[in-house]
C-alpha cells in the first residue's frame, strides 16, 4: 500500500543503513587500534582477564629489573672472590717456596707477598656494584626479588638470598692481610703456621665462591624462565583481545559495499513518494 504519511521502505532501508554504519564503525575501530576487545563493553570477561594478565606482566617486568640488578651485584662479587682466591693460592705457592730459603730469598718472597696482599685489598675495595659490596665486610644479606605470584587476591613475592656471612671475603682473608703475616725473619715453623692460615682462607673462599656461583646460576635461570613467562602471557593476552587484521580488512570491504548499497536503497525508497505525486498530475 502506497502512503504519503508512512514510507515503510525508507524506514527499513534507514534501519539497515544505521546497522551497517555501526558495524563499519566497530570494524574501523578494530583496525585502527589492532584490538578486538579494547574496553570492557566489548567483552567484559575477556577484558577483565586480559587486564589482569597485563598487570601481572608489568610486575614481572619489575622483577626482571630486580633480577638484572641482583645479577650485576652477584657477578661482580663472584668475579672478585675468584681473583682473591687465586691471589691467596699464589701466596700459598710463595710460602712453600720460602721453606728452607735463605734470608735474602725470603726477603724477596716477602716483597712479592706484600704485592699480592695489595692486590687482594684492591679487589675487596673494587668489588662494588650499584653501591653494594658483598665481599668487603657486608653487614646485611642480599635479597633479590625473583618472582611475583598471584592466586586470586593473594600475592607472594619470592626472593633469592645471599647471606652476608657466606661472602664476607674481608673476614676470610683478615689474618693474611694483617701486617706481619710473613717476614724475611720467619722460620719454617712460622711459615707452616702461615700455610695453615692460607689453607683455612682458601677453604672459606671456595665456600664463598660456591655460594655466589649458585646464586648466579639461580638468578640466570630465573631470568630466562621469567622472559619465557612474559612472552607466554603476552601471547595469551593477544589471543584474547587482538583483532585478526585479515578478517577485519575483508569485513571492512564488505561493509563499505553494504553501506553504498544501503544509501542507494534509501534513495530508491524515498523516491517512491514521487510516484504517488504523479498520480495526481493531469
Swiss-Prot record:
Question: What is the stated purpose of this protein?
Answer: Flagellin is the subunit protein which polymerizes to form the filaments of bacterial flagella. The flagellum is required to cause a persistent disease in a murine model of infection.
User: What's the protein called, per UniProt?
Assistant: Flagellin
Upregulating conditions? Expressed at the onset of the exponential phase (after 4, 8 and 12 hours of culture) but not at later time points.
InterPro entries in alphabetical order:
Flagellin, Flagellin_C, Flagellin_N
State one molecular function term (GO): structural molecule activity
Query: Which organism was this protein described from?
Result: Brucella melitensis biotype 1 (strain ATCC 23456 / CCUG 17765 / NCTC 10094 / 16M)
The record lists the lineage as: Bacteria, Pseudomonadati, Pseudomonadota, Alphaproteobacteria, Hyphomicrobiales
Report the leader peptide range. none
Q: Chief subcellular site?
A: secreted
Q: Which domain of life is it from?
A: Bacteria
Q: Where in the cell is it found?
A: Secreted; Bacterial flagellum
Gene field: fliC
Q: Which family does it belong to?
A: Belongs to the bacterial flagellin family.
Which key words are in the record? Bacterial flagellum, Secreted
Q: What happens when the gene is disrupted?
A: A fliC mutant is attenuated in a murine model of infection. As the infection progresses, the number of cfu per spleen from mice infected with the mutant is significantly lower than the number from mice infected with the wild-type.
Listed GO cellular component terms? Answer: bacterial-type flagellum; extracellular region
Amino acid at each position: 500500500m502506497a502512503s504519503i504519511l508512512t514510507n515503510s521502505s525508507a524506514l527499513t532501508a534507514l534501519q539497515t543503513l544505521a546497522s551497517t554504519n555501526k558495524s563499519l564503525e566497530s570494524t574501523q575501530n578494530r583496525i585502527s587500534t589492532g584490538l578486538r576487545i579494547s574496553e570492557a563493553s566489548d567483552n567484559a570477561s575477556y577484558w577483565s582477564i586480559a587486564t589482569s594478565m597485563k598487570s601481572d606482566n608489568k610486575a614481572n617486568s619489575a622483577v626482571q629489573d630486580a633480577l638484572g640488578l641482583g645479577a650485576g651485584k652477584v657477578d661482580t662479587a663472584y668475579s672478585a672472590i675468584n681473583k682473591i682466591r687465586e691471589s691467596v693460592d699464589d701466596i700459598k705457592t710463595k710460602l712453600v717456596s720460602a721453606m728452607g730459603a735463605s734470608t735474602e730469598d725470603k726477603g724477596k718472597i716477602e716483597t712479592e707477598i706484600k704485592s699480592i696482599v695489595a692486590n687482594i685489598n684492591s679487589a675487596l675495595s673494587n668489588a662494588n656494584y650499584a653501591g653494594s659490596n658483598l665481599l668487603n665486610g657486608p653487614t646485611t644479606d642480599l635479597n633479590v626479588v625473583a618472582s611475583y605470584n598471584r592466586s586470586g587476591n593473594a600475592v607472594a613475592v619470592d626472593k633469592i638470598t645471599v647471606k652476608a656471612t657466606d661472602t664476607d671475603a674481608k673476614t676470610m682473608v683478615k689474618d693474611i692481610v694483617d701486617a706481619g703475616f710473613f717476614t724475611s725473619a720467619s722460620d719454617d715453623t712460622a711459615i707452616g703456621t702461615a700455610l695453615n692460615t692460607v689453607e683455612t682462607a682458601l677453604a672459606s673462599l671456595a665456600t664463598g665462591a660456591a655460594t655466589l656461583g649458585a646464586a648466579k646460576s639461580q638468578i640466570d635461570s630465573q631470568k630466562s624462565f621469567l622472559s619465557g613467562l612474559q612472552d607466554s602471557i603476552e601471547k595469551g593476552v593477544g589471543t584474547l583481545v587482538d583483532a585478526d587484521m585479515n578478517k577485519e580488512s575483508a569485513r571492512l570491504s564488505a561493509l563499505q559495499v553494504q553501506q553504498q548499497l544501503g544509501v542507494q536503497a534509501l534513495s530508491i525508497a524515498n523516491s517512491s513518494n514521487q510516484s504517488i505525486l504523479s498520480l495526481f498530475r493531469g
